[in-house]
UniProtKB/Swiss-Prot annotation:
Keywords: ATP-binding, Coiled coil, Microtubule, Motor protein, Nucleotide-binding. Signal peptide: none annotated. Belongs to the TRAFAC class myosin-kinesin ATPase superfamily. Kinesin family. KIN-14 subfamily. It comes from the Eukaryota. Residues 418-747 form the Kinesin motor domain. Residues 1-50 are annotated as: Disordered. Residues 105-416 form a coiled coil. This is Kinesin-like protein KIN-14N. ATP binds at G498, Q499, T500, G501, S502, G503, K504, T505. It comes from Oryza sativa subsp. japonica (Rice).
């Protein structure tokens, strides 16, 4: 049980044995340099035995520790702290070396056990084959002996006939036959025992083989469990997506209701404003009426005073002058008219007061309705905020689940060593009709694509499928982690494949002048420079070198050469491709430029774009007539840990495959088309050989495949974009591209290795 339980770990240790041995050599070199005397007269002080490290957190805490003094001039305090910090660093290095020695010893022990087990298994298989061959030989010998016995029996019968004629001869023959029979019976018994022993041995070997098969099955089950976990996470993501959709629908309903309530509130506010306006008008009118009433009252009082004055005058007149009754009646008439005017004014005042009370009542009802509407609006607003919060949580869960699925998927792909494949479909032009569809749900959502050709449906599944509506930003987000790997010390290769006019150059380069239309190459370089600047605070310093070439008619051209004549004419013969022992690719005499900012790289890309070969065909106004390869070499060193990394980023825009009957190529365009199709055919042959795991892979059949050899047959992280045209007339070519992409997706090229080492003191 313990042997089987440790075998997966042993296999894992075996896969990383090469890395462990390389790391051991690097550690030995670094360790010997680190243990070299720092001066001719003094050895470094021994690490403090009281300093202990429990794990990586303690090491990180030590590396993040900052020197603090009482003030800027406290050099003695800082020096003491620095000496204590150096002691801790020495203790940390010693602990790391001891831990690495322990790990290496354990790895060596496990490798020894694994080799012994494999050797024992080989011996058992050889013994089994030998036993089977021996058993066959024994069976043949037994058959020959049986035939011999039959012949002897016939001979004995003949001798018996002869014995009838001679008793003496019969007796001797009988004795001889009995003796021979006993010998043969003994031989037969021995043969049966030997056969039983061999059968037992065969059974034991079969049991051993069965246990090995069970162990292999357990490894396959382990891989299946990883895939099942990935599937389960996918189902969880789909469930969360469904819940998100439900919440979005609910939120949309609430938004509609909130909008309705808001409209009602706006109407209520409008009514309230109208009522307030009416109230203001009524108040103004009441004030006017009150002023008029006061004026009427004043007039009435004035008239009454006049009446009293007239009455007094009448009395006076009667008494003093004895005026006529007619004059008195006239004065009385005037007095009555004034009294009627006062009465009508009083009635109007009462009417205005009633109108004022009614307006106040309407205003109160309007205020109450407004308060109720505001309360309902606040309630709906809180509910909407709650749903919005729940929606954000669900979206975060979906995002976390998607990130987990991506990590698991990437882990599985790295364990399998497969080339990743992304599919991107360009938008339809106004005069085109589409033949592409996508799964709307299920595990293939976002990963599947369906094409209809001649009334038949073709379905394909890749690591990611981008629909026509996907932006350049959406595409780059999916590969940003892969770009980060180049800074971490990995070799990364991304190339675009597809028929002419399918959007490869737009995907890789885009329009660098417009932010929304920038392609993968400028966006990748922006991320690398931004991240490298951010890592300066952690002690990292990076040096970067850029180069760019094209393969035109099976000839290499340097796109960064300062002399454009060299680019366009026959200077390509001096460029040769070489691969070193570490899997790094070099092109002789190629222009390599040191770059330190995105602006420098942008100017290089502009210069290269002006030199690249493009031409007009019936299928594309600006068709790329060559394969373009941009390479960025990254050299990083951490001043604090002396760790060095070396990464390579290859971004490749392949020329598009095209059919002569559609492109209408003639003359130079015909020659270019033939060269492009030939190199892409060689690439297809290489992929086919890798997929079939053939011993010989024809990398040297073309410049393109030989240049891509480390990416397709080495330890690189490789991603292919297959670009498609969605129009109906291109479905045949699109299906060919998708079949090629599916074959690429199934290729296992090995687990990517990180290029890192520890810098020696001499280098420092």
């Amino acid at each position: 049980m313990s042997t089987r339980a440790t075998r997966p770990g042993m296999l894992h240790q075996k896969e990383n044995a090469a890395d462990a041995q390389a790391g051991k050599r690097q550690r030995t070199a670094a360790g010997s340099a680190a243990r070299a005397p720092l001066s001719a007269n003094a050895a470094p002080p021994a690490p403090d035995p009281a300093i202990e490290f429990a794990g990586r957190d303690d090491v990180d805490a030590l590396l993040n520790e900052k020197m603090k003094g009482k003030n800027k001039m406290d050099y003695k305090g800082k020096s003491e702290q620095m000496m204590e910090y150096i002691k801790k660093l020495r203790a940390c290095i010693k602990w790391l070396l001891e831990r690495e020695d322990t790990n290496l010893a354990e790895i060596g022990k496990l490798n020894g056990l694994l080799e012994a087990a494999e050797k024992h298994h080989s011996e058992i298989v050889a013994q089994l084959k030998s036993a089977i061959e021996e058993s066959k030989a024994i069976n043949e010998e037994l058959q020959r002996q049986y035939a011999s016995l039959e012949e002897n029996l016939k001979r004995v019968e003949a001798e018996k006939l002869d014995a009838l004629r001679s008793y003496g001869d019969e007796k001797e023959a009988r004795i001889a036959v009995e003796a021979s029979r006993n010998e043969h019976l003994e031989d037969l018994r021995r043969i049966k025992l030997e056969e039983k022993r061999l059968n037992d041995q065969i059974k034991m070997l079969q049991d051993t083989n069965k246990r090995l098969q069970e162990y292999n099955t357990s490894l396959q089950q382990y891989n299946s469990n990883l895939q099942a976990d990935a599937t389960k996470n996918g189902e969880t993501i789909a469930k969360l997506q469904k819940e998100k959709n439900t919440m979005v629908e609910t939120m949309n309903g609430l938004k509609d209701h909130a909008n309705s309530v808001k409209m009602q509130l706006d109407l209520a506010k409008s009514s309230q404003n109208e009522a307030l306006k009416q109230k203001t008008d009524l108040l103004k009118e009441v004030d006017n009426l009150r002023g008029e009433l006061q004026q009427v009252r004043d007039d009435r009082d004035h008239k009454l005073a006049e009446i009293h004055s007239l009455l007094a005058d009448v009395s006076t007149y009667k008494e003093m002058t004895g005026k006529s009754v007619a004059e008195l009646d006239n004065a009385m008439t005037r007095s009555t008219a004034l009294e009627e005017t006062c009465s009508s004014q009083a009635e109007r005042i009462k009417t205005l007061e009633l109108q004022l009370a009614s307006a106040n009542e309407k205003l109160k009802r309007s205020d109450l309705t407004t308060m109720e509407t505001m309360t309902e609006y606040e309630k709906q607003k809180r509910m909407l905020e709650d749903l919005q919060l729940r929606l954000e949580e669900a979206e975060q869960q979906i995002l976390d689940g998607e990130n987990l699925r991506k990590r698991l998927h990437n882990t599985i792909l790295e364990l399998k060593g497969n080339i990743r494949v992304f599919c991107r479909v360009r938008p339809l032009l106004p005069n085109e009709s589409g033949a592409v569809a996508y799964p709307k749900s299920g595990e293939n959502l976002g990963r599947g694509i369906e094409l209809t050709h001649n009334a038949q449906m073709y379905s394909f599944t890749f690591d990611k499928v981008f629909e026509q509506s996907a932006s350049q930003e959406d595409v780059f987000i999916e590969i940003s982690q892969l770009i980060q790997s180049a800074l971490d010390g990995y070799k990364v290769c991304i190339f675009a494949y597809g028929q002419t006019g399918s959007g490869k150059t737009y995907t890789m380069m885009g329009n660098p002048e417009l932010h929304d239309q920038k392609g993968l190459i400028p966006r990748s370089l922006e991320q690398i420079f931004q991240t490298s600047q951010a890592l300066i605070s952690q002690g990292w310093k990076y040096k970067m070198q850029a180069s760019m070439l094209e393969i035109y008619n099976e000839a290499i051209r340097d796109l960064l050469a300062t002399n454009r004549t060299t680019v366009q004419d026959g200077g390509a013969s001096k460029y040769s491709i070489k691969h070193d022992a570490n899997g790094n690719t070099h092109v002789s005499d190629l222009t390599i430029v040191d770059v330190s900012s995105i602006n420098e790289v942008s100017s290089l890309l502009k210069r290269a774009a002006q030199s690249r070969s493009v031409g007009r065909t019936q299928m594309n106004e600006e068709s790329s007539r060559s394969h373009c390869v941009f390479t960025l070499r990254i050299f990083g060193v951490n001043e604090g840990t002396d760790q060095q990394v070396q990464g390579v980023l290859n971004l490749i825009d392949l020329a598009g495959s095209e059919r002569l009957n559609k492109s209408g190529a003639t003359g130079d365009r015909l020659k270019e088309t033939q060269a492009i199709n030939k190199s892409l055919s060689c690439l297809s042959d290489v992929i086919f050989s890798i997929a079939k795991k053939e011993e010989h892979v024809p990398f040297r059949n073309s410049k393109l495949t030989y240049l891509l050899q480390p990416c397709l047959g080495g330890d690189s992280k490789t991603l292919m974009f297959v670009n498609l045209s969605p129009e109906v007339s291109s479905t045949g070519e699109s299906i060919c591209s998708l079949r090629f992409a599916a074959r690429v997706n199934s290729c296992e090229i090995g687990i990517p290795r990180r290029q890192t080492q520890v810098r020696s003191l001499a280098q420092g």
